[in-house]
Amino acid sequence: MLRESTAVLYTSTVRDGAMAELSFHLGMLTPLPVKQMVLHGLQIETKKTIRIGRKDFLALGIDDNRFAEIAYDRAQLIGDAAAFLGYDGILVPSARWTCENLVVICDNHDISLPIDLVSSEDVDWQAWARAHGFITTP
């Protein structure tokens, strides 16, 4: 997180989207983490959410060809602007799976609205990552 930037809860709207994010980031580590992970299912309600699609990228200064790279500065600035405008959520395309991710802007999220844990699942992230091409090591 950039200094003075907005705190967010980064989620995926589908299980495989969350697994893809987890696998992408953990797959960059050496050695690969061997500990089993826990995937949590949440029920989240927001009041004022904006949807940003790939069609909006050019106007927002996001290079669609480099979207999957780890270059978060522009996305964080857009998140900061959404927070300033009073949004409590942003729906964005996943860079790693065909789904949307919900970014909850913590400071703007009404504490009376639910962010409820509805499920927890132990996952073998390495097996999932291998099966979906995120890691290739045996």
Question: Predicted regions: what is each one?
Answer:
Residues 1-29:
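Extended catalytic/binding region for NAD+/ADP-ribose chemistry, centered on the ART fold
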Residues 2, 25-138:
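Active-site and NAD+-binding cores of ADP-ribose-processing enzymes
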